[in-house]
């Protein structure tokens, strides 16, 4: 018998197939007495997705209520690439690998809820983190009347021991390595992998090397640098070393190139939207190359005013994504401006990968605003008259000279 009386008849659960969401699946059935539909997204997390189907069937979910989708291309094309056009970095460092995945998962849950006639959705995010906000803001933006169940905010399973006991009571399979407290929690997709908690909670301690899963230790990377060329069209990468690739395949290739060269590690203390600071370890191998390369092609194709405006707006755009406002009108407004700026962001960037670093070492574009005749120090340059700089400087100095005169008057009056 369910312990909660509810008008919820069917719920769509974001289901990974892991222990926590399997416990949530059974908890939803026993607590709400509702039918559970599972949705598992393949975002390139690097794990087998199909076992989630078998796990759900084992736990009593009807086969027709199990949804598994390969979203890798959609994820990179419609979420990752638009974000990278903006040069988005939360607090100047974090490339938003977890944040950008949540809107797509939420969108698919709402679509499945409509398809199956479900009246609620559920997620496995904890009550302390940002993901609960990201999921639920997206749910409500897409379906204002949807009911949301957040088990971690409701249940009394407050310890690992209690979770294991619940799993055993309901015959949920438990891997041996899941019986003790996990040393850290992990989130992963094609863009990144992140680890938080336990061994990482003391920000004074160095991250143990075993935590890293997607990059070799930069100290162990090859002693010879790797050079790659990335082609861009309208701000998006389209080819590596002359080979055209789909969005997901391109990011996969960049991930591998970055992995062997130890590129993309970040040890970060960030300000969560819910108000606390947290320490996390992020690996964004291919994304780190992409960020550097995109800024490289923009450096020769964007006008100064447009480039500086983008840089002013990037923190706001990044914050919106981090906080869960992907579907907000202000994010969409900023996206339209950003996409307009990318019309001529096309060309080729050469990047050097070496022992943890990714550095632009060359860039070219048919739309380049870089004019060698203007900047050369050699004789014969005809497009620029050095004498013109005098008037430019005098005009820009006018307010500074006026302020200086006032300061001199004040100083003289104080001495009198």
Swiss-Prot record:
InterPro entries: Arginosuc_syn_C, Arginosuc_syn_N, Arginosuc_synth, Arginosuc_synth_CS, Arginosuc_synth_type_1_subfam, AS_cat/multimer_dom_body, Rossmann-like_a/b/a_fold. The gene is argG. Pathway: Amino-acid biosynthesis; L-arginine biosynthesis; L-arginine from L-ornithine and carbamoyl phosphate: step 2/3. The lineage of its organism: Bacteria, Pseudomonadati, Pseudomonadota, Alphaproteobacteria, Hyphomicrobiales. It holds the Pfam family Arginosuc_synth. It comes from Methylocella silvestris (strain DSM 15510 / CIP 108128 / LMG 27833 / NCIMB 13906 / BL2). NCBIfam families: argG, PRK00509.1. Homotetramer. It is found in: Cytoplasm. ATP binds at residues 14-22, 41, 124. This is Argininosuccinate synthase.
């Amino acid at each position: 018998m369910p312990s909660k009386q509810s008008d919820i008849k069917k719920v769509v659960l974001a289901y990974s197939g892991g222990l926590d969401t399997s416990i949530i699946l059974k908890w939803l059935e026993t607590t709400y007495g509702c039918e559970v539909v599972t949705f598992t997204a393949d975002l390139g997390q690097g794990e087998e997705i199909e076992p989630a189907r078998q796990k759900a069937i084992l736990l009593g979910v009807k086969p027709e209520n199990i949804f598994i989708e390969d979203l890798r291309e959609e994820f990179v094309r419609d979420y990752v690439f638009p974000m990278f056009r903006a040069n988005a970095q939360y607090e100047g460092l974090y490339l938003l690998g977890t944040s950008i995945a949540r809107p797509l998962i939420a969108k698919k849950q709402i679509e499945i809820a409509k398809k199956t006639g479900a009246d609620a959705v559920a997620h496995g995010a904890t009550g302390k983190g940002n993901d609960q906000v990201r999921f639920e803001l997206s749910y409500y933006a897409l379906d204002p009347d949807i009911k949301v169940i957040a088990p971690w905010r409701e249940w009394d399973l407050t310890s690992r021991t209690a979770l294991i006991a619940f799993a055993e009571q309901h015959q949920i399979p438990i891997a041996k390595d899941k019986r003790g407290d996990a040393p850290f929690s992990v989130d992963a997709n094609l863009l990144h992998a992140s680890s938080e908690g336990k061994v990482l909670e003391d920000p004074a301690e160095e991250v143990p090397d075993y935590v890293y899963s997607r990059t070799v230790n930069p100290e162990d990377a090859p002693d010879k640098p790797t050079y790659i060329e990335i082609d861009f069209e309208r701000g998006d990468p389209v080819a590596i070393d002359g080979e055209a690739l789909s969005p997901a395949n391109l990011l996969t290739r960049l991930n591998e190139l970055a992995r062997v060269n130890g590129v993309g590690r970040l040890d970060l203390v960030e300000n969560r939207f819910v108000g606390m600071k947290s320490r996390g370890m992020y690996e964004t191998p291919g994304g780190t190359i992409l960020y550097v390369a995109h800024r490289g092609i923009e450096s020769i194709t964007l006008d100064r005013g447009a480039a500086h405006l983008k840089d002013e707006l990037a923190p706001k755009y990044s914050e919106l994504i981090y906080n869960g406002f992907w579907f907000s009108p202000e994010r969409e407004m900023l996206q339209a401006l950003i996409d307009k700026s990318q019309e001529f962001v096309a060309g080729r960037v050469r990047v050097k990968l070496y022992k943890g670093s990714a550095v632009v070492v060359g860039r070219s574009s048919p739309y380049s605003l870089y004019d060698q005749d203007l900047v050369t120090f050699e004789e014969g340059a005809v497009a620029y008259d050095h004498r013109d700089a005098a008037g430019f400087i005098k005009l820009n100095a006018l307010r500074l000279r006026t302020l200086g005169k006032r300061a001199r008057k004040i100083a003289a009056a104080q001495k009198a």
